[in-house]
Regions:
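Outer-membrane beta-barrel initiation region
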Residues: 22-125, 161
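Repeated loop/turn-to-beta-strand initiation elements of outer-membrane beta-barrel proteins
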Residues: 59-61, 87-94, 118-126, 161-167, ...
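Transmembrane beta-barrel strands of outer-membrane/channel proteins
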Residues: 63-67, 96-100, 126-132, 169-177, ...
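Residues that define the transmembrane beta-barrel architecture of outer-membrane proteins
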Residues: 74-78, 105-109, 147-151, 197-203, ...
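Outer-membrane beta-barrel "beta-signal"
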Residues: 82, 374-383, 388, 406-422
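Residue-level signature of outer-membrane beta-barrel architecture
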Residues: 84-86, 115-117, 157-159, 207-213, ...
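Outer-membrane beta-barrel translocator/channel fold
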Residues: 128-151, 157-158, 162, 176-188, ...
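C-terminal outer-membrane beta-barrel translocator/porin domains of Gram-negative envelope proteins
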Residues: 182-325, 331-357
């Protein structure tokens, strides 16, 4: 216990130094909405069977390079993560993760720790992160640069277990700060102080579940539903594009389902969405673009400059194993947003569209695409992947020059990626 206490003190010291020395950020810069959303894993189609325990690898890691970045911060993105497992023999994991984009557009660093806490199956996790960005490539006039940091804690406790259904509840809290500087403000004058300087605090109450069924053949489903309540303090903001100050609340949901059709074919469905109970700040809003959303669109696409209060994205992937090491898939992505909560309830709300610089005349609209992908496992733990995405229909939220959020207007997109696990 004394050793564990020393480790926690050491970890807290690292967290503090990280926040002090390396900031990371947004405001209305590059999208980091998903930073606050820990993605759900791909579910297995059958319950795990207890096997003979195997030794825990003390150090594991991942290296990923792809072109899922953005025009504003650099398309090429690299991720490296290292985990130290069970080094105190308490079942704990310490993780270090860094993400960097080409052109020094974005630098992100995250430290995390996860511990069992004595109650059967319960875990306590901490994360601290920081990001620094420069989006001058996209908007040289404003030359926006910024930084943000966050720290969060998450407690999860199982309360129901069976062969086909497992339920857990979770309580978490996050505190994040955002600072953005611009060479000029919206009105065209020099701000003199940070255009955005705000603090967000949020608490979440969540229900986690995973289940197995044979509705069609054999399938597994994982999910999470959360109620969030928080406060946004933007008292020091001079020229914020991000949204209202004060308390806010919303409901979010994530569901992943993997349906085993045959020994070679799977249907993989992913859903995530949120419903705003109050108007939201930019850091809590929802967007439709990016590699894990409607893939043909850029990060932060949807809703103009501020993104949207409510929305959802659903992805369908039909997978087929061509050989033992090669998987092909066809996909369809659909996303829908509502930019303003309670839009139309006031004269002020009705005059909020179109958003300056955008042809966004609809408060609610959708984006969609389809495409093909290929994944090749060249050797154990080494994968190459590529996908082609094609835009379906028009973008109702495009800019006045008919380009997307990142000022491009492509109808087709090809992406490549490389992943090495060790």
């Amino acid at each position: 216990m004394r050793l564990l206490s020393k480790f926690l003190i050491f970890l807290f010291f690292i967290f503090t130094q990280t926040i002090t020395n390396l900031y990371a950020g947004i405001a209305s810069g590059p999208a980091v909405h998903d930073r606050n959303v820990i993605p759900l894993p791909r579910p297995p189609t059958e319950p795990k069977v207890d096997k003979v325990s195997v030794p825990i690898n003390p150090i594991t890691g991942i290296l990923r390079i792809d072109d899922s970045g953005s025009r504003s911060t650099g398309f090429t993105k690299g991720l490296i993560g290292i985990s130290f497992n069970d080094f105190l023999k308490k079942g704990e994991t310490l993780t270090i993760r860094e993400i960097h984009t080409s052109g020094n557009g974005t630098d992100y660093l995250e430290l995390g720790a996860k511990f069992p806490v004595g109650l059967e199956g319960s875990t306590l996790a901490f994360r601290v992160g920081a990001i620094k960005y420069d989006v001058g490539q996209q908007n040289a006039v404003a030359d926006a640069t910024g930084n943000s940091d966050f720290i969060d804690a998450n407690f999860i406790k199982p309360f129901y277990k069976s062969t086909d259904l497992n339920l857990s509840f979770g309580v978490s809290a996050i505190r994040a700060s955002y600072i953005e500087n611009r060479s000029i403000t919206i009105s065209g004058t020099a701000p003199g102080t940070p255009a955005t300087d705000k603090i967000n605090q949020r608490a979440d109450l969540s229900l986690y579940f995973n289940s197995y069924d044979k509705v069609f053949n054999q399938a597994g489903t994982t999910g999470k539903i959360s109620f969030s309540k928080g406060d946004n303090n933007a008292n020091h903001t001079k020229d914020d594009l991000g949204g209202p100050t004060g308390s806010f609340s919303k409901v979010t949901a994530q569901v992943n389902r993997l349906e085993k059709i045959t020994e070679q074919d799977n249907l993989y469905i992913r859903f995530k969405g949120q419903y705003a109970l109050t108007p939201l700040d930019a850091a809590e809003e929802f967007s439709l673009g990016g590699l894990y959303n409607v893939r043909v669109y850029p990060n932060s696409e949807g809703g103009g400059a501020d993104n949207a209060d409510s929305g959802f994205v659903i992805n369908f992937e039909l997978e087929r194993m061509l050989t033992k090491n090669i998987k092909a898939f066809a996909f369809y992505d659909f996303g829908k947003i509502s930019i303003y909560e309670n839009y139309g309830d006031s004269t002020e709300a009705k005059s909020s569209l179109p958003i300056s610089g955008f042809k966004t005349n609809k408060n609610t609209y959708n984006l969609k695409d389809s495409g093909l992908g290929l994944e090749w496992e060249a050797m154990p733990n080494t994968k190459f992947n590529m996908l082609w995405a094609h835009k379906l229909g028009n973008n109702p939220g495009r800019r006045t020059d008919n380009s997307d959020f990142d000022r491009t207007s492509t109808k087709d997109l090809i992406r490549f990626g490389f992943t090495q696990q060790f």
